[in-house]
């Protein structure tokens, strides 16, 4: 037999249990810690859901900083999603040094997808190429190096079948207002950091996979620091 005080205590616990379960449920967004070690796709979906849950309806007469707009004032919304790159932000495969076979496969993949051949060179696009190779193929970004200019820039990675060739714009493109400031062809960017006044574009050359002669002119700079010891 139990004690006489056990029944009141049991009723008290039952009352508390009912009160807790009668409380309206609240949904909370996921924090970052539970996502560690999960796939990048899951993290992106959770991140989008969390950002949507944090969006509040904004008064049309208020700025994001809380300042009330006066008569005649306008505020234009903008989004930084336009600058987002459409691939994962972390490697999805094990990291590895590039090999001859991997360089050839990567080159032909880019050629078949049409994502590089004939594209104007720019520092931003070159960084995107490095990120894509790192995140999708696991290639460490020390492979993307070129011979010095001016003239054709050849890849120092044997097996990579793209080279940078100087191209000339037709007169209409040079005078068009759309190309004056934002077009990569007007930036005159060069992988060696020196402005040679050339407009460069990636060009696919399958012969780069079979022709490798260190004595050729574009490889001489690789041995410029090597002594001629006995």
Curated annotation (Swiss-Prot):
One of its GO terms (cellular component) is membrane. It comes from the Viruses. Coiled coil: none annotated. InterPro entries: HIV-1_Nef_core_sf, HIV_Nef. Residues 76-84 are annotated as: Acidic. It is a lipid-anchor. Keywords: Host cell membrane, Host membrane, Host-virus interaction, Lipoprotein, Membrane, Myristate, Viral immunoevasion, Virulence. A lipid is attached at residue 2 (N-myristoyl glycine). GO terms for molecular function: GTP binding. The N-terminal domain is composed of the N-myristoyl glycine and of a cluster of positively charged amino acids. It is required for inner plasma membrane targeting of Nef. The 155 isolate is from a monkey imported from Kenya. Seems to play a role in optimizing the host cell environment for viral replication without causing cell death by apoptosis. Enhances virus infectivity and pathogenicity. Probably involved in viral immune evasion mechanisms. Homodimer. Interacts with host CD247/TCRZ; this interaction induces down-regulation of cell surface TCR/CD3 complexes. Belongs to the lentivirus primate group Nef protein family. This is Protein Nef. It comes from Simian immunodeficiency virus agm.vervet (isolate AGM155) (SIV-agm.ver).
